[in-house]
């Protein structure tokens, strides 16, 4: 449990006061940003300040994590030699600070703000493959310096629209990004892992959302971590890269709910709010609930609140446990109390996860009529899934517990969370007993299937 916050890098005391606040709350991990700039590929930004900070953090029992994003969205893709120079910089950073053992490669590569291009001219997502190549090179470079270094991949945003034509934000959803990452890994023929942990940023869809609201597929929030685990299993099963069933872990290295400024602290802020924030009371309940919820999630290594203290400009970020004026929010006391009461220990049932072999949310609404005259020539039913899928459907002769011969057929695809009418070619059926049946296959893994069959219905002779 900790924070992602670069504020201690700007302090004159090596972060001592900042870390004292963390200690008071019970937080034990800080993520610091070290930007790689291709214009100055061997310059460690804030090196002297980091050198002053590391021993202070160690004394305070604070683990340091380096997040190493490229300076610009095209810093990696803009030059053929950039991935190699970035990996060399990681080695330089690891040798300069040998007591830091956790490195996050890049930041939100599924978002155009941090990685471009996301799509090619044909509309195909290209960011997963480009990032896979960088991650593979970075993993090998860091392990060559010290095999015990933990390499974190992803740092994924919780949302993406998968729309190459979206104005200004043509992004890739986390599920589809992981799918593309796995496809690139398999195509590369690599025999070593890509990462030791998956980094993920499960921000809420809206700051007014409760902790357990989550997202629809293919995006994901705190309560949808199983969706990411399934995506990872679909992408990497049977490869040298661990899946969550084989011990892969996850680090939620950015999370936060932005809060409205209370009147007594208004003088410490400037500008105008650009989102609809939640209340301080709601944030406190969410943060303490988050600590308890994740305590029962054995695959999560840690949670990092994004920002211990608010930024004073309202157009920026205000999700801290501390207000801009330095006063503690209710969430400060709530998290501290939860941790002090053993909130980091699971008090309920551990959420043990196993991969699914079925299609999530696959369902069908078949006609209720059990007897139909032979003059009927229209046949259809409603199908839906919780994830993208393809289907093969038919009207079959009923043959006990098995399907008989197919007399009508239809194939197609289903978009997640959108019901579709499966309509068969117009045709009269000869008298007899029939059933509808549909077989779903998950779009991200065709070996995951589900078959649904209706109760039998009778077609009887009519004039």
Regions found by a protein language model. Give the residues of each.
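Boundary/entry segment of secreted carbohydrate-active catalytic domains
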Residues: 1-35
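Substrate-binding cleft and catalytic face of glycoside hydrolase catalytic domains
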Residues: 22-168, 205, 310
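Aromatic-rich peripheral "rim/lid" segments of glycoside hydrolase catalytic domains that contact
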Residues: 41, 109, 113-114, 120-125, ...
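Noncatalytic carbohydrate-binding groove/subsite architecture in carbohydrate-active enzymes
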Residues: 67, 82-87, 126-280
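Aromatic/hydrophobic beta-strand junction motif of beta-rich domains
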Residues: 377-385
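Glycine-centered tight-turn motifs at strand-turn-strand junctions
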Residues: 401-432
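Short, solvent-exposed loop/turn segments at the edges of extracellular beta-sandwich modules
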Residues: 442-448
